[in-house]
Swiss-Prot record:
This is Large ribosomal subunit protein uL29m. Its main location: mitochondrion. Residues 1-68 form a transit peptide. It comes from Schizosaccharomyces pombe (strain 972 / ATCC 24843). Component of the mitochondrial ribosome (mitoribosome), a dedicated translation machinery responsible for the synthesis of mitochondrial genome-encoded proteins, including at least some of the essential transmembrane subunits of the mitochondrial respiratory chain. The mitoribosomes are attached to the mitochondrial inner membrane and translation products are cotranslationally integrated into the membrane. Belongs to the universal ribosomal protein uL29 family. It is found in: Mitochondrion. It comes from the Eukaryota. Keywords: Mitochondrion, Ribonucleoprotein, Ribosomal protein, Transit peptide. One of its GO terms (molecular function) is structural constituent of ribosome.
């Protein structure tokens, strides 16, 4: 039976004397604009928030508060909520990649954003329902 050491020695690559290995080119980091849209996925250009900032966040908007807002305000708030959700999920993915435990505050933040988005949808549904019923009422008045 052959020894494995002998076969390993035969398979070894021999490098001739004076051979110079190629040196890889040093690449500089790409320049990224400070206003690049992908920075919206990070708060203060950091992948993870510092522990002192982690638990600081507001509450969800209530439907009563949102009823006073214009459509454009609700539209802007919806996209701010989307951006915040993307930011939170980016942080969550980074924590998973680094094998860190996801803090409870992160889940609470996502819940608050989801509640706000649900309240926005509810207020817009109420407005649509009121518009439809007013339209039907106007039709009934016009036909009688």
């Amino acid at each position: 039976m052959r020894s494995t050491l002998a076969s390993a020695q035969k398979a070894a690559v021999r490098i001739p004397k004076g051979f110079v290995f190629p040196v890889p080119k040093v690449k500089s980091a790409p320049k990224v604009s400070d206003t690049h849209p992908l920075w919206n996925f990070f708060r203060d250009k950091q992948a993870l928030p510092p522990p002192s900032e982690e638990a600081k966040f507001g509450r969800a908007w209530a439907a009563e508060e949102l009823r006073w807002k214009s459509f454009n305000d609700l539209h802007g708030l919806w996209y701010n909520c989307l951006r915040e959700k993307n930011l939170l999920f980016t942080q969550r993915a980074e924590m998973k990649r680094l094998q860190l435990t996801i803090p409870k505050a992160s889940n609470e933040r996502v819940l608050a954003v989801n509640k706000t988005m649900a309240a926005i949808k509810f207020v817009l549904w109420e407005r649509q329902r009121a518009y439809t019923s007013a339209k039907q009422l106007e039709k009934q008045k016009g036909s009688s």
